[in-house]
Regions:
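FIC/Doc superfamily catalytic core
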Residues: 1-134
């Protein structure tokens, strides 16, 4: 329905901005209507991936209910979000290197957020899955 579609796109814009994209809702809607980047920021393609991932997740939950909320779905969503990333980036897989959320090339102590180290991701994701399925 129209309300869900609009809210999904607003969420996609806001979520992608966490990653540093510079797209607004109007630009996303124009891109979807025209399927072209003419006069739009390239980031709109990234933001559209968020829409696709959200739709995939919603469809899975509608089809299977809460049981859809498992690590297979999380990895599928990640693969959608990262499909335009560099070829050596593991799409739908957990990272093997420490990541930071902050300035490009920045140090962990200057980061806005430092996620769990790679050796703790499997354990954390299993905990997340258990919590989602409760």
């Amino acid at each position: 329905d129209m309300v869900t579609r609009t809210l999904a796109r607003r969420e996609a814009v806001q979520s992608s901005q966490i990653e540093g994209t510079q797209t607004n809702l109007d630009e996303l809607l124009v891109f979807e209507a025209t399927l072209g980047l003419d006069g739009l920021p390239a980031d709109v393609v990234v933001t559209e991936r968020y829409v696709q991932a959200l739709q995939l997740g919603l469809d899975a939950v509608r089809a299977r209910g809460r049981e859809a909320l498992d690590l297979t779905l999380v990895n599928q969503l990640h693969a959608v979000l990262m499909q335009d990333a560099a070829d050596d980036f593991p799409k739908g897989c957990y990272r093997q290197e420490q990541a930071i959320i902050g300035p490009l090339g920045g140090r962990p102590e200057d980061a806005r957020f430092v996620p769990s180290p790679p050796d703790r991701i499997d354990e954390g994701m299993r905990e997340l899955e258990r919590a989602m399925l409760k």
